[in-house]
Amino acid sequence: MVTNVATALIGVGDMWIVGQLGDAPTQGAVDIGAKLFAALFTVMNFLKTGTTGLVAQAGTRVGQHAQAQVLVKGVVVGLAIAAMLLLAKPVLLPLMLDALGAEARVRTAAVVYADIRYWSAPAVLVNFALIGFLVGRRRMREVLAIEIFYNLLNIALGLWLALGLDWGIAGIGWSSFIAEFAKLAATGALIWYLAGNDLRAALADRANISLRALKPFLAINRDLFLRTVVLMVAIAMLTRLGAERGAVTLAANGIVYQLFVLAALLLDGFENAAQVLNGERAGDGDRAGFTALVRAILWRCLGVAILLSAAFAWAGGMITDSFAATPAVAA
């Protein structure tokens, strides 16, 4: 759960840094960019969730070599999708910005931010698979350490580039880009240290990256992909409605959205637990244990959701004031 909160902080950090610039259109541009990449990358989150569940199952059924095979498949799929996204960038990025419908000044700033962050696609998608592998092997402390490093680096670079060097919104984009590849390097090095021998064997077996071997991996993630697409379409529609009402409304909605993401990822910690623990039970064929665990996690998730709602009702005003670029945005 704590790990997922750390994941959310990169978007929160970007919104806080741009708030210090004191310009509502620029803050609105970062909001548009953040949601654009949420739509673009989050629909690929099946690389993480699918890898987590399959790695957990493989650990009980076969062993570490099978877990390495799952990781190789996840990385191959991630790189393939990233390559397609980069090839489609000249067409896809303008279309997505048009769909969000921002006014001219906001769009100009959003193009600067989005054009830089878009190139981090390979790192983001491969990181999904790498983090899923670590979660599936219950390496949560290591994941938490990586996420904290990632977020602190992003915030430090953002402050230095955007405010210290006066790069503005471009500095925020570059800080996120650098942080993503630094996270990839750190996560990759850790996994190679933990499972280098198994990974070498899995990479040497070309059958692991054949289309036939990848089909089951893709099939099991189909429903996750479709669910996330529907969610991202809804968020994009809300962003467009905010953009049509001007930069101040867009910036205000962006702050609320980051709090929503923070809460969602906190609750998503229960999903991570379910993926690992139920993956192990599925691997053992323990149907009764599987059902009991699902019920227990749902009740705990409901309790945390109620507590979060109460916290936002009590302190929501103070939180939004600290992020707002201008008093009008806070209001």
Please provide the spans of the model-predicted regions.
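Helix-terminus/linker motif at the lipid-water interface of multi-pass membrane proteins
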Residues: 8-28, 97-104, 160-167, 225, ...
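Small-residue-rich hydrophobic transmembrane alpha-helices
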Residues: 29-87, 127-136, 142-143, 252-316
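Residue-level signature of transmembrane alpha-helical cores of multipass secondary-active transporters
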Residues: 1-4, 38, 78, 117, ...
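Short runs within selected transmembrane alpha-helices of multi-pass transporters and secretion channels
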Residues: 45-48, 116-136, 143-151, 172-188, ...
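Short membrane-interface helical motifs at transmembrane helix boundaries
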Residues: 84-115, 307-331
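Interhelical loop/hinge segments that connect adjacent transmembrane helices in multipass membrane
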Residues: 176, 188-231
